[in-house]
Amino acid sequence: MTCGSYCGGRAFSCASACGPRPGRCCISAAPYRGISCYRGLSGGFGSQSVCGAFRSGSCGRSFGYRSGGICGPSPPCITTVSVNESLLTPLNLEIDPNAQCVKHEEKEQIKCLNSKFAAFIDKVRFLEQQNKLLETKWQFYQNRKCCESNMEPLFEGYIEALRREAECVEADSGRLAAELNHAQESMEGYKKRYEEEVSLRATAENEFVALKKDVDCAYLRKSDLEANAEALTQETDFLRRMYDEETRILHSHISDTSIVVKMDNSRDLNMDCVVAEIKAQYDDIASRSRAEAESWYRTKCEEIKATVIRHGETLRRTREEINELNRMIQRLTAEIENAKCQNTKLEAAVTQSEQQGEAALADARCKLAELEGALQKAKQDMACLLKEYQEVMNSKLGLDVEITTYRRLLEGEEQRLCEGVGSVNVCVSSSRGGVVCGDLCVSGTAPAVNTRVCSAPCSGNVVVGTPNACAPCAGAGACSGGCKKC
């Protein structure tokens, strides 16, 4: 069994083996974190007991001391070991304790920077892909042929339709404005009538109150007068009846003078009954007069109430008409505002359409001008190309003529050399951009002396002549001194 403990940078180990097994050496090292045991000065201490075997102590690489003992008849004990206290003191390695934290922070920062760098790389790749995509789109749009479309008739038709709609809206707005004016005039008339009716109603109510007071007073006076008249009438009737009775009695008394009649002049009249009867009559008359007055008053009140109800109904109808007119005015005002807004929108749309049409027309004109310029340039380029082509064709024709002339000259020279003809002078003139004409003249019978070629631009002819004269120069006098004769 092996046990290890760390204390102050040193390690102590002890090993014991029990049983009949051979002794084994146990080497222990005292490691220090981050430092190899071979560079440190730390040492280890170990002890070993072997039962049934003996092995001498040995010193290992860990600077430990070992001792061996024999387990036999001796008591099982561990020998005393001396320890150097200086070895137990911690070593001053001058290492910053925050170095590990700093290294960890540096590693984290490096990881963060690596992550940011990877993100930047991904972003750069994405932007490169976007750039490639945009370049592809740009090339596609550059290579795509733009189709010419004549949009001017469409815009003109649309603008004309909008103008017709605007005219219809203007006509509707004029009609609605006239209707609004008519409705406002009607409303003013109804308002004046309503105000007049209100003032008339107030005047009528005041007159009704005054008349009611007068009627009440007149009714009371009439009742009093009727009662007085009734009483006076009854009293007059009563007095008349009394007078008639007395007159009749007197006449009968006068007519019967010869007859002595014993009369009882004590008029035995029951005045209480007469008064009670008259009072009853007066009460009856008063009650009938009161009933008639009440019935008349109720009739008048009913008539006045009916008049008030009729005027109230008329006023209610007038108010309903006024409210209806107000609602109509509000509706017409809203319709007019809506028509104005729609007219404004249509005018704005017409203006915008006109602007867009003008812009499209201007753009079309610019494009037409550009196309005309490009067409003119293409025509000029074509004319230049045709001119160059004509010049090239002329040059080709001249070269063909020269080649033909040279071939004839060579054939003639070969024939002359073969036949032994006299000397031949050759004068060649080339013309740039024109048709070259050549005159071939062979003369003389003398042996061949020399052959001369005049390559100067004399008159545009290729001439073969005698050695005495250059035919083109002699004929026209236009040689520039290129030939020897001239």
Curated annotation (Swiss-Prot):
User: Which positions fall inside the IF rod domain?
Assistant: 106-417
Ranges for the region named Coil 1B are: 152-252
Looking at the UniProt record for this protein, which Gene Ontology cellular component terms does it annotate, in alphabetical order? keratin filament
Say yes or no: keyword DNA-binding present. Answer: no
Where are the annotated segments for Coil 2?
A: 270-413
Spell out the residue ranges making up region: Head.
1-106
- Record-given protein name: Keratin, type II cuticular Hb6
Organism encoding this protein: Mus musculus
Protein encoded by which gene: Krt86
